[in-house]
Design a protein with these regions (language model features):
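Extracellular-loop-to-transmembrane junctions of the mid-late helices
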Residues: 66, 105-180
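Membrane-proximal first intracellular loop
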Residues: 1-102
Length: 180
């Protein structure tokens, strides 16, 4: 239980760090917060690359770590709670069935393992989506007419995993994203 609380505290620490970086990102150089506080336009390749690094290091990676910590917290806390609940139930009816406790622990473990797999799958998807970003950067350096990336962010959906994946993916492809 104490390990679960520790992982939970680390999880929320990572969450607030990524959230603060998210709001700080709105005032990244090159934005126009007075007119469009959630619209980020980056026309220069150097600035766009710096923004890309900041987005991953300051927001996406801490958010992924937060999800992992939360998963481990769930794993330790729910396993302990499940075993105690099952134990109390079996004692109340004078039936000691340890298999029920083991089955509950296995179910909670598989559910948390599935959530980790989901996070890893989204990360792999975002990595493979980056080839358009690199190709566009090369086109910009070669002198092609390349407009800056647009990334519309809705803060209300920051913690929504689907919107995060969609937002990062279309930002890497330099397409406008409307997350509502």
């Amino acid at each position: 239980m104490s390990l679960g609380c520790l992982f939970g505290a680390l999880s929320y620490a990572c969450y607030f760090m990524s959230l603060s970086n998210f709001y700080r990102m709105e005032y990244w150089p090159g934005t126009r917060p007075a007119q469009e506080p959630t619209n980020i336009q980056l026309a220069d390749i150097t600035e766009r690359t710096a923004f890309h690094d900041y987005w991953w290091a300051g927001i996406v990676i801490p958010h992924a770590i937060q999800q992992c910590f939360m998963t481990f917290a769930d794993l330790f806390i729910l396993e302990r709670l499940a075993s105690r609940v099952v134990e109390s139930l079996t004692q109340s009816v004078k039936i000691r069935v340890k298999r029920l406790s083991t089955a509950a622990n296995v179910i909670f473990f598989l559910l948390n393992l599935a959530s980790i797999g989901l996070m890893m799958g989204c990360g792999i998807y975002n990595i493979f989506a980056g080839h358009d970003y690199l190709r566009s950067s090369a086109a910009y350096r070669s002198g092609d007419n390349f407009t800056g990336a647009q990334f519309n962010v809705d803060a209300n959906h920051f913690n929504d995993l689907a919107n995060n994946v969609q937002g990062v993916s279309c930002w890497l492809r330099h397409e406008p994203c409307n997350l509502h």
